[in-house]
Each structure stands twice: as structure tokens, then as C-alpha cells.
UniProtKB/Swiss-Prot annotation:
Protein family according to the UniProt entry: Belongs to the universal ribosomal protein uL18 family.
Full protein name: Large ribosomal subunit protein uL18
PANTHER family: 39S RIBOSOMAL PROTEIN L18, MITOCHONDRIAL, LARGE RIBOSOMAL SUBUNIT PROTEIN UL18M
GO CC, one annotated term: cytosolic large ribosomal subunit
Function as written in the Swiss-Prot or TrEMBL entry: This is one of the proteins that bind and probably mediate the attachment of the 5S RNA into the large ribosomal subunit, where it forms part of the central protuberance.
Any single GO BP term: translation
Keywords: Ribonucleoprotein, Ribosomal protein, RNA-binding, rRNA-binding
Subunit architecture: Part of the 50S ribosomal subunit; part of the 5S rRNA/L5/L18/L25 subcomplex. Contacts the 5S and 23S rRNAs.
NCBIfam families: L18_bact (TIGR00060)
Organism (species): Polynucleobacter necessarius subsp. necessarius (strain STIR1)
GO molecular function annotations of the record: 5S rRNA binding; structural constituent of ribosome
Amino acid sequence: MNKDESRQRRARQTRIRIAEAQANRLTVIRSNSHISAQVYSPCGTKVVAAASTMEKDLRQAIKNGSYAEAAKQIGKLVAERAVKAGVVDVAFDRSGHRYHGRIKALAEAAREAGLKF
């Protein structure tokens, strides 16, 4: 099993546990050059709130989407949008990535902006 298969296995197990708990899910999608986050409803089919470094207004404000500073802004923005939609309690789905760097920065910013997980 290589590194990517291990990450995908961890992500799958996390999503199964979150689905069994019937919780709203804050999912993080990380690439080499961008980061995005989405809050899904408990059924897992409806996106309640989303934010990404690929959004037009954010691309102009953020020089590079692959830094922790960009992740902080995305975390804050997705939390504000989720709270506005009435979602406060979420389960954090880090997509199998380590809780470190950009993932950690996004999570801490989301907590500071009002999400609880």
C-alpha cells in the first residue's frame, strides 16, 4: 500500500464514522496549489457552505493559494457562511491528511470564526 492509498483509506474510514454519527461534515480538499472547504448536511448530499482559493474575489486577495495564510482565510470564510446558514456543530473531515500545516490552519480559523468540532 503506497502513501496515497493509505490516505484514501483513512479518509474513507473517517467518512463512514461521520455518516454513522449523522453529523454535518466540514471537508477539506487540499491540492498543491489550492485549498477549499465544504460543509455537507448530515445526509452527505447537500452542500450547506463552501469556500475556496479558486473563487474570483479571493484569487485577487490571496497571492498564493498553497500557503497557510490562505488556509486561514478559507477556514474563516467557510465558518462564517456555515454559521449564516445555521450550522454550528460539525465533524471535521481532513480527507486523510495529517492535522498539520494548511489543514491545521484552516481548522483553527474555522473554530475561531464560530464552528464547533
